[in-house]
């Protein structure tokens, strides 16, 4: 004998049957209307589309630091498919890499390298320019601002490429052999003693509240002359005696043609403003701010047009390896498909991305699925691996960790036009 079914139970069973029937109808309708080919649906497929299908391994690596060692978390590069040689790239004319050694002069090495490439692009004779000449006068101008601002100005070895350009406009340039900054038979740059003395002098000046600019700059120049030598007032060029500014004019470089770009949400896009990093010690507001896709596209576009590009990058990263000459973003940081304006800005505002090095981009390589960039680098890490003086940056590294670039205005004419249209 079957138990009697109540009216409520009967209605409940009827509801279940109707729900199942509706589910079947929706399932077959979706199958009939949906695409017939296999598509990137679901978490796993979406992960592949976003470059996260293969996870990078994180390992601890011992690195030399002074007389000792430190342990740092780095990416395991053994399985990385990467370029092995600059010959794999479409290369633009540039002079061989030069080491900056124990100095903070990367900003000047990168800018000088760009201008040397520009001379070659313009059909001028190959010319090695002096980095130390520009650095000398940068120290003078840093001291001048420190005095004028009553000590409220950054004192560091770093600077930005547009500051190097400003110093050349102000003081001119000379050739490398005309001013090496190397005394007493030295062959490697070392500014450690120079910078210590420079900083101590200015900090003592601040403590004494002595703001006599003329006296301070005379003392600063004496310190610079002691460590680097006195820069020449005139140089001999083919039998003619020229000042550094006259020599700059003779090169045919218009330094007003070089423009700098950033990509940050703290400024309205397609406007100019300040690049908010300590190395922009003079608070320049000459930076063009553009959306990230335009920013990244402008760098590759410039290279394709034959213009090299100076980059300001964060190199203190687990995906940056001198031993393998590469810069990439590992998946344990962020899958590359998720790199966007917000993730870039987030790392900048919390200090995870810092502007700690300037390099010179001199080529590119497009090979599915990646684009790689050939980087001429003056820092010591670029001399640890099999390829001396170069790095290979993958596009994701450029997108997330390159915070500023500078190039010739003709390389980015279309982008500059957007600024004219918005004003």
Model-predicted regions and their roles:
Residues 19-29:
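Bacterial N-terminal signal peptides
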Residues 9-20:
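Bacterial N-terminal signal peptides that target proteins for export
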Residues 34-39, 218-423:
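Active-site signature of cysteine proteases
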Residues 1-10:
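Short, Lys/Arg-enriched N-terminal segments with co-localized hydrophobic residues
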Residues 27-32, 118:
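Hydrophobic membrane-targeting alpha-helices
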Residues 86-282, 286-293, 297-309, 380, ...:
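Active-site nucleophile-adjacent alpha helix/oxyanion-hole segment immediately C-terminal to the catalytic cysteine
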Residues 39-93:
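N-terminal regions that are enriched for targeting/export leaders
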């Amino acid at each position: 004998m079957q138990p009697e079914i109540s009216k409520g139970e009967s209605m409940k069973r009827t509801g279940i049957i109707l729900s199942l029937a509706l589910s079947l109808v929706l399932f077959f309708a979706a199958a009939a209307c949906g695409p017939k080919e296999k598509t990137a649906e679901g978490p796993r497929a979406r992960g592949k589309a976003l470059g996260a299908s293969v996870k990078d391994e994180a390992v601890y690596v011992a690195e030399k630091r002074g007389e000792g060692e430190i342990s740092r978390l780095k990416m395991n590069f053994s399985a990385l498919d990467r370029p092995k040689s600059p010959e794999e790239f479409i290369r633009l004319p540039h002079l061989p890499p030069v080491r900056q050694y124990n100095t903070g002069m990367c900003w000047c090495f990168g800018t000088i390298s760009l201008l040397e490439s520009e001379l070659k692009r313009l059909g001028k004779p190959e010319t090695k320019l002096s980095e130390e000449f520009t650095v000398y006068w940068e120290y003078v101008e840093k001291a001048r601002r420190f005095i004028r601002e009553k000590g409220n100005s950054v004192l560091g070895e770093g600077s930005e490429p547009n500051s190097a350009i400003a110093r050349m406009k102000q003081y001119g340039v000379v050739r490398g052999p005309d001013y090496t900054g190397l005394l007493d038979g030295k062959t490697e740059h070392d500014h450690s003693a120079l910078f210590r003395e420079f900083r101590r002098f200015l900090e003592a000046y601040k403590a004494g509240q002595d703001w006599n600019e003329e006296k301070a700059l005379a003392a600063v120049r004496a310190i610079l002359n002691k460590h680097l030598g006195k820069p020449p007032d005139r140089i001999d060029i083919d039998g003619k005696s020229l000042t550094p500014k006259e020599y700059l004019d003779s090169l045919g470089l218009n330094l007003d043609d070089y423009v700098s770009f950033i990509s940050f949400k703290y400024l309205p896009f397609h406007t100019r403003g300040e690049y908010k990093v300590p190395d922009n010690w003079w608070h320049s507001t000459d930076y063009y701010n553009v959306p990230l896709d335009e920013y990244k596209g402008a760098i590759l576009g410039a290279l394709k047009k034959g213009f090299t590009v100076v980059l300001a990058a964060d190199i203190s990263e687990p995906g940056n390896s001198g031993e393998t000459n590469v810069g990439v973003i590992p998946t344990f940081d962020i899958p590359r498909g998720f790199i966007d304006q917000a993730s870039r800005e987030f790392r900048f505002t919390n200090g995870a991305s810092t502007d700690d090095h300037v390099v010179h981009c001199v080529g590119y390589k497009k090979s599915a699925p990646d684009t790689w960039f050939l980087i001429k680098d003056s820092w010591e890490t670029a001399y640890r691996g099999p390829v001396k003086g170069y790095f290979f940056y993958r596009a994701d590294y450029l997108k997330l960790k390159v915070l500023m670039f500078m190039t010739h205005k003709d390389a980015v004419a279309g982008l500059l036009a957007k600024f004219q249209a918005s004003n």
